[in-house]
């Protein structure tokens, strides 16, 4: 599910973050190349930007690009996201607009995170203000309720340096390390299905 105005795909990796900075840089480069190859193979226009811990795909086809990037080994998950300046007003406006477009009743929550101290609000305050913005946007049509444990609808916001990313869902990827960064291995495959499945795992 895309937030209104989605213009990018946030790509998350896991195992790569445990590597040294030198090794991680090489793996990030290979991951970007692999994502670019997947996009090209599926005819999806997009520019892949290499960023620490969060590669980005800038595209006019965010859902298709998110699904393609999620097929790359090394990727833990992807999300279609709307970007905006790391300023409270546009973030809160985007939360309200997203709720107006996609919230259809039931409980909701805001999951807000920030990296660094330059943003003027902490994560808890941003979540509280965002919840208020969503409530005011939908209260005339629905009877909203907040449920932080098991909400029916969640708006996620990550604030990183000078940019904020708003997203709704995550597409799971295979995880692991990028294809082409490890030495080849041999898998003994018998006639059944268990062997290739075990080799993949």
PLM regions with names:
Residues 1-186, 200-201:
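RNA-binding accessory domains that recognize and position tRNA/RNA substrates
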Residues 194-199:
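Short glycine/serine/threonine-rich phosphate/pyrophosphate-binding segments
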């Amino acid at each position: 599910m895309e937030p209104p105005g989605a213009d990018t795909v946030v790509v998350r990796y896991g195992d790569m973050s445990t590597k040294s900075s030198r090794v991680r840089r090489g793996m990030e480069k290979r991951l970007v190349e692999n994502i670019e190859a997947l996009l090209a193979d599926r005819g999806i226009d997009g520019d892949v930007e290499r960023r620490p811990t969060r590669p980005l795909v800038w595209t006019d086809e965010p859902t298709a690009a998110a699904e393609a990037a999620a097929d790359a080994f090394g990727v833990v998950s992807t999300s279609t996201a709307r970007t905006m300046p790391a300023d409270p007003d546009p973030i809160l406006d985007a939360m309200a607009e997203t709720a107006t477009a996609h919230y259809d009743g039931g409980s909701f929550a805001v999951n807000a995170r920030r990296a660094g101290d330059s943003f003027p609000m902490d994560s808890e305050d941003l979540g509280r203000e965002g919840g208020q913005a969503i409530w005011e946007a939908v209260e005339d049509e629905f009877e909203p309720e907040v449920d932080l444990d098991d909400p029916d609808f969640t708006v996620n916001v990550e604030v990183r340096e000078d940019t904020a990313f708003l997203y709704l869902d995550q597409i799971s990827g295979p995880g692991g390390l990028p294809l082409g960064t490890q030495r080849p291995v041999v898998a003994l495959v018998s006639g059944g299905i268990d062997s290739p499945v075990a080799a993949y795992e």
